[in-house]
């Protein structure tokens, strides 16, 4: 009975998960989601075409304190930069051929220097379609068209396998603790073997 219920519910659960995760995967995104302060990072912007029209242009506004440095050339796209009055910089990728067709995506790679302090970097992107319509990826996390976020962390911070943030000192302390425990275990094993050998010798 339980097996039947599980078999019935599994497709529904999987379908629900796909329903909720699919729209997010179609968003314009900038990766990595986390980067060290003060570093030169290689970022990748992924742009899917959500309409039955080609995407012909993408404009990405650099977050505050993030300094655009260079880009990777892509056949079929020309790149230009523009400085604004607020000292921010926008980078434009414009198609010289067919653009991003329906059902396709394109990745744009560039290098930028991160700010020297920890902060959130919000990537505002503007996606232009062939009919002149524009999708503004500038909203917050819960918006229909959210901007991508990169967490700029302290240079000494790292993220462990559970997603928790810790400093390099913590990592070193963890390593030292592990070595101490190993040494204690080996010492205890040596003592046990010594006692066992002594008892055996006395019995003999």
UniProtKB/Swiss-Prot annotation:
Annotated stretches, region: Disordered: 146-176
Comp. bias (Basic and acidic residues): 158-168
Membrane topology qualifier: Single-pass type I membrane protein
Effect seen on changing residue 27 to A: Decreases the ability to bind Cu(II) by approximately 2-fold and abolishes the ability to bind Cu(I)
Upregulating conditions: Significantly induced under copper-limiting conditions.
N-terminal signal peptide: 1-26
Membrane-spanning ranges: 179-199
Bias kind Polar residues: ranges: 147-157
Cellular component annotations (GO), alphabetically ordered: plasma membrane
Topological domain spans for side Extracellular: 27-178
Record's subcellular location: Cell membrane
Keywords: Cell membrane, Copper, Membrane, Metal-binding, Signal, Transmembrane, Transmembrane helix
Xref: Pfam families: DUF1775
Origin superkingdom: Bacteria
Binding site for Cu(2+): 27, 50
Site (Stabilizes the metal-protein interaction): 137
CDD domains: YcnI_like
InterPro entries for the chain: YcnI-like, YcnI-like_sf
Domain characteristics, as noted in the entry: Adopts a cupredoxin fold. Employs a monohistidine brace motif to bind copper.
Function of the protein: Copper-binding protein that probably plays a role in copper homeostasis. May act as metallochaperone, possibly to facilitate copper uptake via the CutJ/YcnJ importer. Preferentially binds Cu in its oxidized Cu(II) state in a 1:1 stoichiometry.
Name used for this protein in its record: Copper-binding protein CutI
Species in which this protein is naturally found: Bacillus subtilis (strain 168)
Taxonomic path: Bacteria, Bacillati, Bacillota, Bacilli, Bacillales
């Amino acid at each position: 009975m339980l097996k039947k219920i599980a078999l019935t519910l599994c497709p529904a659960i999987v379908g629900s998960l796909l329903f909720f995760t699919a729209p997010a995967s179609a968003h314009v995104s900038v990766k990595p989601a986390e980067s060290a302060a003060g570093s030169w990072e290689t970022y990748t912007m992924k742009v899917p075409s959500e309409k039955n029209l080609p995407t012909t242009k993408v404009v990405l506004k650099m977050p505050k304190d993030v300094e655009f440095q260079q880009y990777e050339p892509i056949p079929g796209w020309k790149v230009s930069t523009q400085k604004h009055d607020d000292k921010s910089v926008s980078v434009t990728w414009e198609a010289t051929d067919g653009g991003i067709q329906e059902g396709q995506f394109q990745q744009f790679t560039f290098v930028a220097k991160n700010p020297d302090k920890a902060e959130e970097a919000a990537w505002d992107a503007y996606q232009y379609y062939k009919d002149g319509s524009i999708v503004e990826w500038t909203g917050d996390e819960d918006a229909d068209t959210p901007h991508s976020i990169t967490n700029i962390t302290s240079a000494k911070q790292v993220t462990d396998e559970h997603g928790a943030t810790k400093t390099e000192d913590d990592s070193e302390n963890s390593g030292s603790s592990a070595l101490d425990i190993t040494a204690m275990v080996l010492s205890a094993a040596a003592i046990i073997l010594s006692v066992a050998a002594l008892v055996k010798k006395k019995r003999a």
